[in-house]
Amino acid sequence: MPTSDPGLRRVTVHAGAQAVDLTLPAAVPVATLIPSIVDILGDRGASPATAARYQLSALGAPALPNATTLAQCGIRDGAVLVLHKSSAQPPTPRCDDVAEAVAAALDTTARPQCQRTTRLSGALAASCITAGGGLMLVRNALGTNVTRYSDATAGVVAAAGLAALLFAVIACRTYRDPIAGLTLSVIATIFGAVAGLLAVPGVPGVHSVLVAAMAAAATSVLAMRITGCGGITLTAVACCAVVVAAATLVGAITAAPVPAIGSLATLASFGLLEVSARMAVLLAGLSPRLPPALNPDDADALPTTDRLTTRANRADAWLTSLLAAFAASATIGAIGTAVATHGIHRSSMGGIALAAVTGALLLLRARSADTRRSLVFAICGITTVATAFTVAADRALEHGPWIAALTAMLAAVAMFLGFVAPALSLSPVTYRTIELLECLALIAMVPLTAWLCGAYSAVRHLDLTWT
């Protein structure tokens, strides 16, 4: 071997109180050399046989980078190196530029902007603006002072609904965007309902609501068919509109007052909620059927797994739509009853009680549903209870302390149900008690409905003659 080989380095490595002379390759990374050096020192008893992280450094210099070679670090023949264990904790980093360090820290903690969140925000904003504009048009139609351009207003609203429906088709069929398609379909349904309400001449009444509900049902079904997206939501809207249309049709035929129509619609909605599971099974084709002559040896006569899976998914979608529709129709009926009875001394308490019981029943049903369905029940129940509380507070404006105390109590109950109750482990007796309370509240809907329909007054004024 020549006296001076440029590919080798003759160095002395110190480790604690021991030292060893080694010839190391100059083109091998330091991280590859360290295990061999540790093994040599370990054989000589200079290092304990414990796992640790080692570093190699020159005298009075920082540790050599593990990815570099001895030649790159400037190590020559005769150099003295020190093998030592690395510290358990890395040194605290120091910042030369405070502004750059602050920006880097914020970049690591800030969440990236989610495109889905932006799209949902835009969809929610568009829906709320459309609903707000529709409510203002309905308010103007109910007022006796605003009577001009009613036909033109209905035409513009109908044209806007058709345009929204056209853009919904483009969004779903061309761009494959279900969020935009569903939002535009809902907007078209709102415009269709408002156009139907304004199409009836005169001040809106039961007949106007009937036309509006049928227009909303037709628009939602049409949007669902031509767009192919948002089937669950649009089905729920259509079913809810059909229930409202049926209730208003009864009111138009019998000339019943609004509290009676609303209370009967609410009671019917709870009845439909009880049979919604059976309806979903029937509509999905999962109802048990007796085949005419089933041969056990004929495998083709039995349903396949794929077909059963498709029907099961269809039944789940139908159940979600029906539950949402009937919960919404119960909410609309209860709110309409509470608002219609406001100012009527005899029936005001009945409307408030009906809305409060309806909200409680919907909130109780939210505990036994999954995430999607419980959210619908919770929103409907909270809206109904809030309406009942608002009407009751407006009826008793002179009792300010009681209103403040009731507000604080309801807020505390809401916080308890949202944050504390989910973490509690309830006993079977408690579950049975809650179910019993739900049954009692459902039974109480019948006498409340009879009260609001005027059944008790009619019986009281009967002139029965016993012979």
From Swiss-Prot:
Keywords: Cell membrane, Membrane, Transmembrane, Transmembrane helix. Pfam families: EccD, YukD. GO terms for cellular component: peptidoglycan-based cell wall; plasma membrane. The keyword Endoplasmic reticulum does not apply. InterPro entries: EccD_transm (IPR044049), T7SS_EccD (IPR006707), YukD-like (IPR024962). The keyword Membrane applies. The chain crosses the membrane at residues 122-142, 152-172, 186-206, 209-229, 241-261, 264-284, 319-339, 344-364, 374-394, 401-421, 439-459. It is found in: Cell membrane. It is a multi-pass membrane protein. Was identified as a high-confidence drug target. Part of the ESX-4 / type VII secretion system (T7SS), which is composed of cytosolic and membrane components. Belongs to the EccD/Snm4 family. This is ESX-4 secretion system protein eccD4. It comes from Mycobacterium tuberculosis (strain ATCC 25618 / H37Rv). The gene is eccD4.
